[in-house]
Amino acid sequence: MPSLYFGTELKLHKEVKPLILAFISGVESGKIKKNNMTPEEEKRVDRAIEILEESPIYLEREPNYDCMFLENMIEKYVNQYEVGAIMIDYVELTPPMIGEYTRMTRGLQAREDSILLNVSTVLKNLAEEFDVFIKIYTQISDNARRDHTIRDSGAIKGSKSLQVRADLGVVVMRPVERELSMLKPLIDLYGEPNICLNIYKNRDGDLGEFKVWGRINLGNYHFEELFITDWSYRPFREKIEKVYLHSDTKDEFVSELETDTVHIMEDDDLPMFDEETGEIIEEVRKPRGIRRSRS
């Protein structure tokens, strides 16, 4: 799918492009920037460059933007390049936004929450009008960095009105020691996470608030999911649908998955949980499947 990255801070060719090449190749961006790679890594990066050049990925940068700029940019890339996914990194209050809102409201006091709510509304309308996926990033407040219990819209720096129109809201943070101690039974089974995706808003989703724990390599942004919990750090106990395979294809199917990024678990591999608390009451051996990078 043709995609657009719109940035406000990072330099596109010196900072963003190496990150994309790192993700495609699996070679960490620091090595790419310093040209400190092995011959094998150089081959992978060269191939990643070819893939990127052949891919419909477009990059734009503009620190001082307003809603009209976003509307014109999105319309241009949808109509000219058939873009279907747009990433905005990141949304914050800008002087052009303040001026635009003041003119629109004929001098009404331009409060930050009102302006960002307008931005959220405009982006939601553009997503619906052009039938595109729009993902925006914003900054985390200092309070959320200090307090691990703030992992919802209260973690947004500036104003949480920015997420009002969003269908999905996620706060991405490193786990603190207190959280890791509460997760010890799961960590013993699946490994220790260094990142958590706190999904606090999931409109029309089967799950409400939940947390996805995983490991991320910040050098190439490869992410490995480890386990999922509810907002109280208890593992989910969802119904698992069984898939039955013909004996002739089962071994081949399982082998293919286990060399990808999926854990294959037999029934007796699954831990037993307390019905009331969700705590693990019987630990079992680790699953047979081993997660491996696709690269």
Question: Model regions: which residues?
Answer:
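Cytosolic-facing regulatory segments adjacent to core modules
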Residues: 2-82, 212
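Hydrophobic/aromatic beta-strand patches that form the interior of the parallel beta-sheet core
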Residues: 4-6, 58-60, 135, 170, ...
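Structural recognition of the conserved hydrophobic beta-strand(s) that form the central parallel beta-sheet
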Residues: 5, 87-88, 132-139
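Short, ordered loop/turn segments at secondary-structure junctions
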Residues: 8, 91, 139-140, 174-175
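Helical mechanochemical/support elements of P-loop NTPase systems and associated helical scaffolds
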Residues: 12, 16, 37, 41-44, ...
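Short acidic/His/Gly/Ser-rich catalytic and metal-binding motifs that mark active-site loops
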Residues: 14-16, 94-100, 143-147
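C-terminal regions of RecA-like/P-loop NTPase motor modules
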Residues: 26, 31-32, 67-75, 79-83, ...
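Phosphate-binding/switch loop-helix module in NTP-utilizing enzymes
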Residues: 58-126
